[in-house]
Swiss-Prot record:
Chief place of localization: cytoplasm
Enzyme class: lyase
Name used for this protein in its record: Histidine ammonia-lyase
Example of a GO MF term: histidine ammonia-lyase activity
Domain of life, per lineage: Bacteria
Gene it is expressed from: hutH
GO cellular component term of the entry, any: cytoplasm
Cross-link 5-imidazolinone (Ala-Gly): residue positions: 142-144
Compartment annotation: Cytoplasm
UniProt KW keywords: Cytoplasm, Histidine metabolism, Lyase
Pathway in which the depicted protein is active: Amino-acid degradation; L-histidine degradation into L-glutamate; N-formimidoyl-L-glutamate from L-histidine: step 1/3
Organism per entry: Pseudomonas aeruginosa (strain UCBPP-PA14)
Amino acid sequence: MSLHLKPGQLTLADLRQAYLAPVRLSLDPSADAPVAASVACVENIIAEGRTAYGINTGFGLLASTRISPADLEKLQRSIVLSHAAGVGEALDDAMVRLVMLLKVNSLARGFSGIRRKVIDALIALINAEVYPHIPLKGSVGASGDLAPLAHMSLVLIGESRARHRGEWLPAAEALAVAGLEPLTLAAKEGLALLNGTQVSTAYALRGLFEAEDLFAAATVCGGLSVEAMLGSRAPFDARIHAARGQRGQIDVAAAYRDLLTASSEVARSHEKCDKVQDPYSLRCQPQVMGACLTQMRQAAEVLEIEANAVSDNPLVFAAEGDVISGGNFHAEPVAMAADNLALALAEIGSLSERRISLMMDMHMSQLPPFLVANGGVNSGFMIAQVTAAALASDNKALAHPASVDSLPTSANQEDHVSMAPNAGKRLWAMAENVRGILAVEWLGACQGLDFREGLKSSPKLEQARRLLRDKVPYYQEDRFFAPDIEAASQLLASGCLNALLPARLLPSL
């Protein structure tokens, strides 16, 4: 993928593509003037002997310590070295690429006082697929993501290591792959690299992208379950949802109507049945999934804004010659957006688990117990449903909001923090749980449909059915179940059901 970056104009679709695959990045010339002006402003402050935080002072509680001109370069190198204190497993290439892209986008807006040479070095690393070692843990999301961004920056100054095509290389070798040599950071540049919400935002963006894929899958699986359970189409009638007026609900109901078309043989087979109302997990899908969609859309809006934000501190306002300390590094918007995504993921999984449970109950489903013939000898989906219940329960605990937590840091100078990285990365575990739940529902709904006398569903739902059956055959009798769940999960992880939903239903798709 080629991406020509106009600073401050990244879209969610751009970010999704950059997360999914390597990117060839170029920077629009419109960045040149503001970047150069901000550097000149910093140089003027030093030349005039003015005191400005982060340029010629210490950091955090040490902000009142004035640094001599002779030590300014050492100050910037020292902050990178000392702040690289993260722990845990290394972020994968996709996450590091996303972090670096977000950092380039922020720096290139020209409020950070950092030379184009440093920005170009980050771009060169991205284009050469050289990804610095960044540990997963160590940031509280204020003052920015200091530790992980320090690890990113180490490679630029010739320290630490980076991964290139799966191989870890010492920094000097990694820089050479990208045609670079170690940089000497000028005044303000180390702090500009370290300060910002780019890691928190990248964590939450990954959560958003996975949540979107799972939302699409849950909608399709929910439609398959309606068919397998001989559910009514009446609850998806547009008039019901227009009467309430909730946009997410209206859009989701339309998506279900698109899936559950009148051409379905399954639907025609029970047109004149005397069933009045279906259980809520079938009937209220537009209401529940619509509320989830609304939360996801709101979170996506916040994250797209943050992806284009300047979250450095202090900020350089070159036109006025001012350098002003503020708090844009505080990732509270990101933390709250991630918390809302967590609620949506928990509900998507919870609703799916309830549909699975319905299909297991022969009195509710009019299907063989646990979706298998010769019950007793065969146990069928009995324990697969238990697995789904375990995963749904796990997500209820993980959904607790991270943004309500705070611990003071830096000797109480940084006395309220966002915990946005925790809010974001827990979404990955939640998404994995939801994927497992939906894998069981997909398997179960297709098995249920196989019992419906060879009747076909709608074209789109039949496509979803074929996708699964190409990997997992019908259950004639009990067999080793876990590989089938894994096969379905891997299919879901590919986003293979996204195309079955209407275009632009989800923010980045």
